Amino acid sequence: MIDEPGGHREVVLTHPRSPTERAILQSWAEEHHPGARVLPVWAGTEVPSALGEVLATADDGARDTVIVPARVTWVTPESDEPGAVRRLRGLAVTAAMRMAWSPLHPAMAHYRPDAARVVAGEQATVADLVSRFVAQAGGGPGSTGFARFVARQAVLACDRAERKVLGDRYKVPRRMVEQITSSSRFAALVERLAGETGSPAAEISRRLRSCLHEMAAVQSPPAIDVFRAMMGPMHQKTWDVVVDESGLERLRELNRQHALVFLPSHRSYVDPLLFAEVLHDRDFPRNHVLGGNNLSFWPMGALGRRAGVVFIRRSFGSDTVYKAAIQEYLGHLLAKRFNLEWYIEGGRSRTGKLRRPRVGLLRYLAGALAERPGLDAVLVPVSIVYDQLHEVGAMAAEQRGGEKRAEGLGWMYGYFRDQRRHIGTARVRFAEPIPLRRALDEAGDGPAQLEKVAFRVCAGINRVTPATATSLVTFALLSARDRALTLQQVREVVAPLADHLEAREVPVPVAELRTRHGLRMTLDRLAEAGVVTIFDGGTEPVFSISPGRHHVAAFYRNGALHHLLLRALLELALLRVGDSGEGEDLVEVAWRELSRLRDLLKFEFFFSTRREFRDEILRELDLVEPRWRERATSPGDVRAALRRAPLLVAPGVLRSFVDAQLVVADRLAALGEDPVPAEQEFLTSCLGVGRQMLLQHRLDRADSVSRELYGGALRLAENRGLIMESDGLGERRRAWLGEVTAVIDDLGRLGDLQRARLEVVLGTGEEPAPVRTDVEGDSDVAS
């Protein structure tokens, strides 16, 4: 060490992995820090005693000694080029240079001397490092952990410097478990858990360390490149990807101050792979993706963990230590500003619309913030939507009662094979970011706090989810009720849907819906997937949903239903207003009906607050009848407004869900006062009864025979107190059945009007007749 002109001394702390790197670093130090002492900390070895000796002099007044971290970074040919590593040769070169295998260093330095770059981390005095160590670990410069702490800080400083060369996409955590377990927070956590559980502190410490090692992702640039190259075939050829670039740039600015928690919708196994590639290509740091350990089989588990996947046990019951480990790990990641990602629905949607959110991980995230008052995280709702998915057929089979195939190597091979065919576009869009602390405050205290935050995330996803051509075309064909339509007839059915969505400022693919060529391409893709049948043996081709493929078509249709939900509810409410007697308050009738429908469907769709819901309904009414305040003064006026409306969507939007409720309500009513069997047994019986009722034409929609829809109806029944034994249970079950039957009757009346419209489109009918008014006993649906 030498004294600098400013009176301080310098120590260059290097991290060589080979004699070649040591020579490069020594030469660099002599040029840039002449006379400074160079201390190598070899990878995988203990901190050298010489560093401890240097730091020990801090007690003798040498705290102005400056530590200069430095290491060699091998820059690959692809470092400045975004995009996946696609060729095996490129992968081999990139992986070799990223791994920087020490036996290759002499050859790499000889043939590619420009590839070896020395990166120097931010310098710090020993005094600064002592202050940090005291704050984080509670020790002093003389403690045994101080030298390890300094070496760890040097590694992190070099990581930050390296990212300026390689880009933010290779921001990777280092020694996370060691950082967590060496902190004063960890010691306090062990003491608290020992007191709560009555277990010895040593046992708690061992279990916590084991849990942290089990879940912690150990990212490395070589593993990331290998993982991307291996997983690329699962999505690269399948879709063209369209990204909300402006939304992502806003997030980049936010990420400079806060960790981001990406919460995407979940439709496919490839969601995290495709989303990771979107971020990688735009030089975003790689997310820590929290996923179930059902996907941790070889080689996914080994590679995934090194590429940022955090495998969480799918169930851990009352394991207090494991829960504490998750919370501590998440909090540490946020504190270090590493971004997170998980899928708030808890699994892939089997119906095509957002599932009810799971709040378990959100609870641990909120707990981590509560323990760190100066920390915040920003939730980012993300919509990932596909024109088509190869895996929809398998998910549809599960809903009809089929078994889910277990994930493994055989499953992966089949998935790779299926993904080789191009099937359209994937769209990634970002909703308004939500600061978590503010969201928790606005949700208020109480047991529903986290659920309100999760619903807010889901509402954000729905708002930015575009309506795809596939969703609107399948909506039109399913609404035709197994009738085949010509291309022009499909256009005429789709046009009012597209008009309505554009009036609501919902993104719609104009080129695919407004032109014959675009619409035909959409139908041809659906035909290639077996969803649509094309018959061209007559005067012109006609299109219909293929037999047995209604669940698949409904999956695509359901992706746009949230944009049509308010319209559907309003149509039903107006129908009831049209049934009102003279002298009734029409506005009161409408709001009463809307409130009832909202409660009936609250486990299937996401609704805004009641005040916001009222404003949304009024805006929707302006689209249905712009002069409703002047013209809707009597029930007859309202019935006339329904006849004039260019679009009726309620049967297409709601019938499947209400049909599913009918099956569950019918089974509960049949039980009388008896208890409900175990959930899975009950749902299986509903599948059988649902198939029977469909064959008897007591149900209108084949896609209503669905385990997931029956599950939603069962949650509603539980919410209404129709599961557990109580006074008047049988009567209340029958009352719910009557309520559902009445809604089905209303949908049937609107369906009559809708079918009359379709006959006009087909050229086989006249203008719709007046709306059929409600007459007691009019329903043709047996209970």
Question: Over which residues does each language-model region extend?
Answer:
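Membrane-interfacial terminal anchoring regions of lipid-handling membrane enzymes
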Residues: 1-783
